[in-house]
C-alpha cells in the first residue's frame, strides 16, 4: 500500500514538474514571439524612414543630373567658340557658367538611425544592409569628396574675377558689355570652362548619376519590404505599354562572354539584373531596366540599350548591348 502511494505521488510530482516546464517553455516562446514582433515593427519603421529619405534624395539627384546636362551643353558651346556677345546678352543664364554650382548632400538620418539599431535587423536582410552601406557610405562619400573639389574651383574662380575684373560685381551697361566681350572672346575663359566641365559636369554629376542609378533598384527593394502601395514618384523611369504581357519572357539566368552568370528578375513591376554571386553577399549593385519597347530596355546603370534576342520559336535566348552578347542558359523547352 505504502509503495503504491509513494509511486502515485512520485508520478504526480513528475507530471507537475513537466507541466511547469511546458508552461515555462511556452511563456518563453510567447515572449520570444512578442520580442520578435516588436523588433520587426521597429525595423519596418526604420526602413520606412530610409525609404522616404532615399525617395527625396533620388528626386533631388534627378534634378541635379538635368541641371548639369544643360551645363555640359553650355560648356561645349563655350569651348568650341559657338557663343557670341549677343548670345550672352540675350540669355543672362549663360553669364554664370563657371561662377555657380548646385550641390547635393544626401539625407542620411534614416540610414544612420537604422545603423544605430542593428539588433533589430533580421538576418535575412543582411544583403539589404550591404546595399545600403554601399549607397550611403561608398557612393555618397565619393560624391561628397567630388563636390568639395568642385566647390573649391568655383569659389576660386569667383575670387579671381572679383579681384581682377571690376565688371564682375557691377550691373551697369558698360560693365555688362565688358562682361559679354570677355565671355565671348577671352581664350582663358574657355580653359576655365574646360576645368568646370571636368570637375563639375563630368566628375561631380557623374557621381550624382551613380547615386541615382544605383538607388533606383534599392528604392524598389525597400518599397517591397515595407509593403508600400503608393504609386512610384514621378521621377522614376517608366516602362513602355505592354510590359506586363512580355516580362516573363526575360526572366532567368544568362551567361556573359567572360563566364559571369547574371540573373534577370522582377521587383515591383520592373526588371533588374544582378550577378549570381556565390557566397554570403553580393558587392555589385543590381541594374534596373526600364522597357523602351518590346525586347528593348534601358540599363540605368550603364546607360546602354539592351536588345533581347529571340529564336525562331519566339523564345528569348539572350541579349546584346552593342558591345557584348549575353546568352540565356535556362531557356525552357
Region roles according to the model:
Residues 1-11, 32-242, 266:
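Long, hydrophobic alpha-helical segments that serve as membrane-spanning/inserting helices
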Residues 12-14, 300:
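A generic fold-level signal
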Residues 14-29:
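Hydrophobic membrane-insertion alpha-helices, especially the h-region
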Residues 230-333:
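Peripheral terminal and inter-domain segments
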Amino acid at each position: 500500500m505504502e509503495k503504491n502511494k509513494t509511486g502515485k505521488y512520485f508520478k504526480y510530482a513528475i507530471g507537475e514538474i513537466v507541466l511547469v516546464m511546458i508552461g515555462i517553455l511556452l511563456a518563453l516562446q510567447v515572449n520570444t514571439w512578442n520580442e520578435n514582433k516588436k523588433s520587426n515593427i521597429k525595423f519596418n519603421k526604420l526602413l520606412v524612414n530610409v525609404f522616404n529619405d532615399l525617395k527625396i534624395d533620388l528626386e533631388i539627384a534627378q534634378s541635379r543630373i538635368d541641371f548639369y546636362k544643360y551645363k555640359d551643353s553650355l560648356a561645349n558651346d563655350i569651348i568650341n567658340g559657338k557663343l557670341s556677345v549677343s548670345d550672352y546678352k540675350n540669355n543672362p543664364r549663360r553669364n554664370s557658367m563657371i561662377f555657380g554650382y548646385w550641390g547635393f548632400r544626401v539625407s542620411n538620418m534614416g540610414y544612420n538611425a537604422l545603423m544605430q539599431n542593428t539588433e533589430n535587423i533580421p538576418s535575412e536582410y543582411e544583403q539589404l544592409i550591404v546595399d545600403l552601406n554601399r549607397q550611403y557610405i561608398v557612393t555618397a562619400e565619393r560624391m561628397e569628396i567630388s563636390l568639395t573639389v568642385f566647390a573649391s574651383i568655383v569659389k576660386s574662380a569667383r575670387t579671381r574675377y572679383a579681384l581682377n575684373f571690376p565688371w564682375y560685381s557691377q550691373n551697369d551697361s558698360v560693365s555688362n558689355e565688358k562682361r559679354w566681350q570677355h565671355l565671348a572672346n577671352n581664350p582663358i575663359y574657355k580653359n576655365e570652362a574646360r576645368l568646370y566641365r571636368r570637375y563639375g559636369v563630368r566628375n561631380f554629376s557623374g557621381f550624382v548619376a551613380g547615386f541615382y542609378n544605383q538607388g533606383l533598384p534599392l528604392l524598389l527593394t525597400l518599397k517591397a519590404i515595407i509593403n508600400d502601395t503608393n504609386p512610384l514618384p514621378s521621377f522614376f523611369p517608366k516602362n513602355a505599354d505592354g510590359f506586363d504581357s512580355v516580362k516573363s519572357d526575360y526572366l532567368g539566368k544568362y551567361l556573359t562572354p567572360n563566364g559571369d552568370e547574371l540573373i534577370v528578375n522582377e521587383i515591383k513591376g520592373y526588371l533588374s539584373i544582378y550577378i549570381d554571386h556565390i557566397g554570403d553577399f553580393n558587392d555589385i549593385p543590381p541594374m534596373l531596366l526600364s522597357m523602351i519597347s518590346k525586347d528593348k530596355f534601358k540599363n540605368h546603370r550603364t546607360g546602354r540599350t539592351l536588345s533581347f534576342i529571340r529564336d525562331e520559336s519566339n523564345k528569348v535566348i539572350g541579349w546584346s548591348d552593342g558591345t557584348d552578347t549575353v546568352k540565356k542558359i535556362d531557356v525552357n523547352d
